[in-house]
């Protein structure tokens, strides 16, 4: 959610900080600010709105200085306003940026008021700022003051602190909110995502839970939750420098839709041999972890949850294991039964989704045999803390509405189905069919992208609609759910998805000429039942848009528009039918003039509960 960038250098850093914020805009925000130390003084500029507003203000009134911090804020405590925007100051000495929620901020605020501190904002973050200032009265360094401060905090935080009286130092702390250190030559950096720092460094170390780090131009010292000095592995980023550029595309979302064939090629590459998915696709020790699995518990949020829902059908139908899929925030707050030989699977593009992380930690305490994450972010918390990791290799995804991450997640889950299935007696023929399907996916997705022009024309029908209904059966039901989510996310049209067999149990009451019904209809064993559902909608005057296999024998008429989808096998069908639904949501949003890449009120990476 909130974006953080910090720098300690000999050169002026304001431009580096603002560029870092631009590269974090995908996280969602409502205001932005920067504070820089120059000649022993803290200078700060904040603006409500886009980073461009902050950039324009700095062009008019530049900030000089080699040590600074910057932030994009997602409002949690206090409305979006300049006085609530970060960085926050204490007595003109301390500046702080923060991502997370301090749950005991009311109690701390009252204590600080008793010590004479005055609050200028409604945020929980200002508590951190004044606490550090207060701790400096009894601690001899900024590091010691921050270490004492975080011991008083309850909740989640990723925070960076600077002091005008100690102008070549940042102190960084994390608990429940990610931070990464970037290493330069005679300069060092910090950010909430390595993407922010790629223009200035490619060497990174990820802080772990409870870490506090002291960062100067030439040194980085990291201390664990107990105050012991520790080393964190420094890795070279695999993300390309231009990952944050749109290139020839109008929006990141469209770019990422069209990157799906390449993303799938990368995720499959090196993971199939002799007509089998290799156990090592999930880690060096995966064979041992996966060989006796009889139950799979999948935990995820949003789009990732839909990927897990599709995988449930595969794992139960083809791999011969029971499977449960649950929203992470729900899993945490109910007493679930642990089955013997259970595998916990988390799915997260960022690897830092707060609810998913917390659910995974709870599951480990419960005694799951093994944990696996399907993730796109090397070095993220889920990757570090799980027994196994399937690295998606989808490349940076900037658009808030997930596209290529979803299809790559589906591919990874199909691979997991093949591996668990092999350990449970799946035939060699089925394994070969799955691997053949995986290897054919990139080309088949390329074919599906050929529907773009037809779908752009179709989108005109949705421009004046306020509601839409998506229908699917079997493993296409989660795809209908994903299609509905995409439409509501970026076009702001209220959309719902139902298993088509549920039509009689409520949704039919909504059907009329103003409620478009979108149906996904691959040529599978459920097709004839789906056709019956279509007739139920037709009989009630509904206008339908059917994405159907070219061999499915649907014909367009006055009440039904049929969009032929390239023929595909049962293994890849959910993935292929996702593509036209992504394109539909994109083109409807384009016509409506909404913010495609940064839809209102949404964030890419949800790092607070």
UniProtKB/Swiss-Prot annotation:
It is found in: Cytoplasm. The active site is at residues 2, 604. One of its GO terms (molecular function) is glutamine-fructose-6-phosphate transaminase (isomerizing) activity. One of its GO terms (biological process) is UDP-N-acetylglucosamine metabolic process. It catalyses: D-fructose 6-phosphate + L-glutamine = D-glucosamine 6-phosphate + L-glutamate. It holds the Pfam family GATase_6. Its EC number is 2.6.1.16. Catalyzes the first step in hexosamine metabolism, converting fructose-6P into glucosamine-6P using glutamine as a nitrogen source. HAMAP family: GlmS. Homodimer. This is Glutamine--fructose-6-phosphate aminotransferase [isomerizing]. It comes from Shewanella oneidensis (strain ATCC 700550 / JCM 31522 / CIP 106686 / LMG 19005 / NCIMB 14063 / MR-1). The gene is glmS.
């Amino acid at each position: 959610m909130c974006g953080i960038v910090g720098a300690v250098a000999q050169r002026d850093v304001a431009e580096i900080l603002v560029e870092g914020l631009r590269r974090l805009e995908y996280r969602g925000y409502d205001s932005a600010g920067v504070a820089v130390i120059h000649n022993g003084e803290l200078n700060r500029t904040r603006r409500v709105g886009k980073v461009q507003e902050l950039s324009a203000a700095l062009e008019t009134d530049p900030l000089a200085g080699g040590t600074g911090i910057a932030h994009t804020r997602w409002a949690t405590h206090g409305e979006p306003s300049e006085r609530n925007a970060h960085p926050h100051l204490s007595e003109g000495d301390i500046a702080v940026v923060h991502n997370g929620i301090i749950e005991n901020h009311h109690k701390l605020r009252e204590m600080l008021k008793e010590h004479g501190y005055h609050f200028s904002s409604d945020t929980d973050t200002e508590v951190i700022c004044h606490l550090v200032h207060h701790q400096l009265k009894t601690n001899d360094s900024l590091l010691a003051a921050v270490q004492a401060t975080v011991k008083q905090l309850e909740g989640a935080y990723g925070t960076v602190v600077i002091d005008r009286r100690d102008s070549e130092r940042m102190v960084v702390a994390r608990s429940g909110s990610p931070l990464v250190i970037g290493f330069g030559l005679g300069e060092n950096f910090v950010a909430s995502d390595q993407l922010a720092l790629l223009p200035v460094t490619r060497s990174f170390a990820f802080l772990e839970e409870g870490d506090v780090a002291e960062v100067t131009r030439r040194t980085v010292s990291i201390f664990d939750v107990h105050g012991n000095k520790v080393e964190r592995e420094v890795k070279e980023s695999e993300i390309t420098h231009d990952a944050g550029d749109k290139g020839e595309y109008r929006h990141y979302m469209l770019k990422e839709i069209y990157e799906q064939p390449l993303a799938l090629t990368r995720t499959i590459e090196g993971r199939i041999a002799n007509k089998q998915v290799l156990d090592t696709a999930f880690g060096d020790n995966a064979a041992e972890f996966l060989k006796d699995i009889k139950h799979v518990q999948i935990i995820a949020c949003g789009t990732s949850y839909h990927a897990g829902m599709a995988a449930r059908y595969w794992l139960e139908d083809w791999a011969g294991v029971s499977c449960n899929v649950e929203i992470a925030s729900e899993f945490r707050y109910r007493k679930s039964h642990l089955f013997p030989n259970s595998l916990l699977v988390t799915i997260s593009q960022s690897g830092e989704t707060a609810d998913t992380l917390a659910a995974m930690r709870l599951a480990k305490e419960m005694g799951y045999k093994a944990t696996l994450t399907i993730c796109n972010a090397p070095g993220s918390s889920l990757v570090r803390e799980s027994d196994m990791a399937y690295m998606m290799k989808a490349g940076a995804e900037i658009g808030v509405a997930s596209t290529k991450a979803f299809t790559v997640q589906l591919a990874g889950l199909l691979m997991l189905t093949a591996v668990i299935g092999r350990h449970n007696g799946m035939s060699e023929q089925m394994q070969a069919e799955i691997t053949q399907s995986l290897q054919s996916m990139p080309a088949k997705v390329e074919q599906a992208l050929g529907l773009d022009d037809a779908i752009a024309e179709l989108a005109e029908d949705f421009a004046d609609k306020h509601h839409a209904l998506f229908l699917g059966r079997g493993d296409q039901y989660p795809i209908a759910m994903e299609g509905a989510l995409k439409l509501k996310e970026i076009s702001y049209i209220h959309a719902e998805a139902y298993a088509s067999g549920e039509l009689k149990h409520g949704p039919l009451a909504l059907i009329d000429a103003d409620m478009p019904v979108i149906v996904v209809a691959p040529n599978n064993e459920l097709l004839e039942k789906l056709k019956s559902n279509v007739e139920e909608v037709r009989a009630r005057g509904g206008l339908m848009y059917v994405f159907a296999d070219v061999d499915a024998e649907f014909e367009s008429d006055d009440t039904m528009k049929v969009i032929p989808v390239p023929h595909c096998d049962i293994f890849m069908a959910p993935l292929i039918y996702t593509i036209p639904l992504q394109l539909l949501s994109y083109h409807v949003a384009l016509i409506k003039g909404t913010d495609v890449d940064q839809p209102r009120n949404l964030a890419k990476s949800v790092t607070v509960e």
